[in-house]
């Protein structure tokens, strides 16, 4: 663990705030989780200082118009999902492929898989930061693309916690 990570882990107030903001879920705009997290943050910041304001700022954005994941088989299983921000579109008929499970999706997992990733749908587990061996989902995505994956899935390891979001 780096010195700053240790300092963050040792700061009880920081870790309480971190756990609180994570408890709202993905906080993707328009989900309700975003508003709940913002309301919490405004309340928390007002405890620290009196001059706290919410400012609306226009920005260019990306919006998903539709999404879906179905495990094919004897009885197809439709899974809840949310695309990573700025995900590429598939053609209107979708995309079909074989899943390769790379566990935590660390560099060593991708190295072990080697050419087996090419042409497959890569599945990795989501993990939260502040662990010394944490790999951000964007890095996992980049490794999957670099090795020729046709799609990328991140599974939430927390039961019934819902789909994940982010970039």
Predicted regions and their residues:
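BRCT (BRCA1 C-terminal) domain core and associated BRCT-interaction motifs
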Residues: 60-70, 153-156, 160-166
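A conserved hydrophobic secondary-structure block that centers on an alpha-helix together
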Residues: 107-164
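Short, compositionally biased low-complexity segments
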Residues: 14-16, 165-167
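Noncatalytic luminal/extracellular "stalk/propeptide" segments of secretory-pathway proteins
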Residues: 7, 11, 19-121, 127-128
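Short, contiguous pre-domain boundary segments
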Residues: 1-4
């Amino acid at each position: 663990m780096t010195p700053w990570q240790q300092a963050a882990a040792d700061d009880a107030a920081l870790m309480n705030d971190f756990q609180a903001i994570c408890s709202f879920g993905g906080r993707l705009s328009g989900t309700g989780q975003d508003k709940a997290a913002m309301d919490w943050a405004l309340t928390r910041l007002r405890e620290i200082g009196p001059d706290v304001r919410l400012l609306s700022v226009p920005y260019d954005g990306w919006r998903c118009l539709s999404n879906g994941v179905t495990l094919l088989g004897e009885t197809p299983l439709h899974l809840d999902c949310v695309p990573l921000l700025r995900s590429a579109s598939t053609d209107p008929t979708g995309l079909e492929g074989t899943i390769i499970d790379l566990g935590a999706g660390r560099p060593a997992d991708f190295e072990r898989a080697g050419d087996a990733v090419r042409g497959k749908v890569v599945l990795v587990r989501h993990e939260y930061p502040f662990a010394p061996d944490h790999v951000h989902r964007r890095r996992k995505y980049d490794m999957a693309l670099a090795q020729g994956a046709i799609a990328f899935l991140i599974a939430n390891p927390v039961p019934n916690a819902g789909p994940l979001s982010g970039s």
